[in-house]
Amino acid sequence: AEFSRDVAKSSVDDPLNARYTPFDGKPAFLQAAANWYRNVHGVELDWRSQLFAVEGAVDGLAGLFAILIDRGDAVAFADPYYPSYHCMSVMHGAEEILLPARAELGWLPDLDAVDESVWRRLRMLILNYPNNPTGAQAPASFFEHAVELAKRYGFLIVHDFAYTGLGVSDQQVSLLTVPGASDVSVEVGSLSKMYAMAGWRAGFVTGNRDVVARLKQYHYQMGSMVTGMIQDAGAVALNSDQSCVDELARRYAGRREIVAGGLRSLGFDVFDSAGGIYVWFKAPEGWSGQRFADALLDVAQVAGPPGTCFGHGGKDWVRLSLLKDESLLREAVRRISAAEL
């Protein structure tokens, strides 16, 4: 948001921002995050004990793996998945359990189909909605079921909430809206997508007090604090009326219609996503996602990663980004049409 840039520019002149800021996060930033949860999601948080500032969602996820996962611990997440979940699992020697997400279920995993033995040995369940790469959104009932399972079997839920705000507003569900969710879960938030601050590196981890306290202790020794002027800018964004987020969501909705609608008119099977910043579509009959993505690049000069970049579950699919402006997206659809693949 432009007003965040203005705040950051003025904050450069604050001599306090040239010093180490509080490692937990500046109080104004943490209070703003708590205000955002209250105003947007109706969730009450104690900013002192339930919020911790991190340098983006990946920083928060990496810290959670470091404090929670030992070699051999079981970590589960849906397939397709954001690649960092797999990489962090491998780096920590975790047992990786992939939960198949299927198109007919709206690209959500069927939690009832998971064998009880998996739940009994599980240490961490990672959820990510709105989802990367599919754009899927999870209803409140899905989160309620996940929380019930976590309470019954004693595992922790980590919800990667990086894409919140960029979809249909009444479907943007925070896991923490579920009663008792903070007993068994943490949510990782990011300012990167909803405020177009990807390069600024600011976010937060919130929820379970014990986990947040452990993450703070880890970060004191192995991490650093978020730059002061970035926290100042982030606090203003979080405390704003969120009209900038609504405008960005409308812009992405328009771009989504250009790409998804264009692909459908060409006969492609496109997932009807209402969130995120990507379009997830199936390669034509007889093509793998990898082969079709290669052909798109070679013939149409349109770049989009094949679904196999996000796990075996995406092997027949391709992801296209909506980050470019409308004219370039229309040109991409035109090129795909002209390629006649």
Regions found by a protein language model. Give the residues of each.
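N-terminal small-domain helix-loop-helix segment of the aminotransferase-like
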Residues: 1-56, 63, 237-240, 341
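PLP-dependent enzyme catalytic core of the Aspartate aminotransferase-like
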Residues: 286, 295-305, 310-341
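Conserved glycine-rich beta-strand-loop-beta hairpin in the small C-terminal domain of fold type I
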Residues: 235, 252-260, 270-282, 314
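Helix C-cap/helix->beta junction micro-motif
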Residues: 92, 149-153, 266, 300
